Amino acid sequence: MDDKELIEYFKSQMKEDPDMASAVAAIRTLLEFLKRDKGETIQGLRANLTSAIETLCGVDSSVAVSSGGELFLRFISLTSLEYSDYSKCKKIMIERGELFLRRISLSRNKIADLCHTFIKDGATILTHAYSRVVLRVLEAAVAAKKRFSVYVTESQPDLSGKKMAKALCHLNVPVTVVLDAAVGYIMEKADLVIVGAEGVVENGGIINKIGTNQMAVCAKAQNKPFYAVAESFKFVRLFPLNQQDVPDKFKYKADTLKVAQTGQDLKEEHPWVDYTAPSLITLLFTDLGVLTPSAVSDELIKLYL
């Protein structure tokens, strides 16, 4: 499976199911790559998979694709030392890969079951941009016959908040789209804030769509709970202390980074994500359970060791 086939397969997965997270599509692609690989050694197979992950990160530069790919590789590689026979080892790796995929497919429902209980009847929720996990949580709250209303930021520059509002309208949830600049104004009307995350970093902070950080700062100033929801495959080995510590490969779209390689200055570009410090986050809801930001490092160590 060459780079062109790999990219085409990844894009076809995304097109088939628009509701699928890019990281899940990347893991499906890597599993298919593993099945088709014609390598003859475990070391060669690992090298090929690492190269495939780098190729996919070049197509979709989100944090989740990078962390999901790395966790997939670690999960399937745990068996490589147990078997000396290559064909048997590869078969076990494929089985473990399929198990990993099944596990992460159930993540959103687990998170929704944990988080929707924190939404009280009659609550007013503020959310940011479009998040599939947040949407699943709100679907679970609707299914539990809870009445609530939602404010969603329009989320420039792609207006993904309007997509979220449309999805909530289909659930018959009262929803109002507000300007990104109106977060401080609208915060006093909200009872709680729920946002998704593109990545959860080692100190318990999150990397998410630009504008998340200012929302968290406003929530903290007005003593409103700020909840983040994210699947465990988004746990990434990064330890940023400020916005500048977030690598450019996560801040900008893949196309922008390619243009930057020709010499264009990235200072002219707007970043797509920002970093929210753990001190601003009340709780993180993951498929591993409900975590305080300080507990994230323990879970991350378990995942990566």
UniProtKB/Swiss-Prot annotation:
Assembly and interaction partners: Component of the translation initiation factor 2B (eIF2B) complex which is a heterodecamer of two sets of five different subunits: alpha, beta, gamma, delta and epsilon. Subunits alpha, beta and delta comprise a regulatory subcomplex and subunits epsilon and gamma comprise a catalytic subcomplex. Within the complex, the hexameric regulatory complex resides at the center, with the two heterodimeric catalytic subcomplexes bound on opposite sides.
UniProt-recorded name of the protein: Translation initiation factor eIF2B subunit alpha
Subcellular location as annotated: Cytoplasm, Cytosol
GO molecular function: guanyl-nucleotide exchange factor activity; translation initiation factor activity
Annotated family: Belongs to the eIF-2B alpha/beta/delta subunits family.
Listed InterPro entries: eIF2B_alpha/beta/delta, elF-2B_alpha_N, IF-2B-related, IF_2B-like_C, NagB/RpiA_transferase-like
GO CC annotation: cytoplasm; cytosol; eukaryotic translation initiation factor 2B complex
Gene symbol of the encoding locus: EIF2B1
Activity regulation text: Activated by the chemical integrated stress response (ISR) inhibitor ISRIB which stimulates guanine nucleotide exchange factor activity for both phosphorylated and unphosphorylated eIF2.
GO term, biological process aspect, one: cytoplasmic translational initiation
Superkingdom in the source lineage: Eukaryota
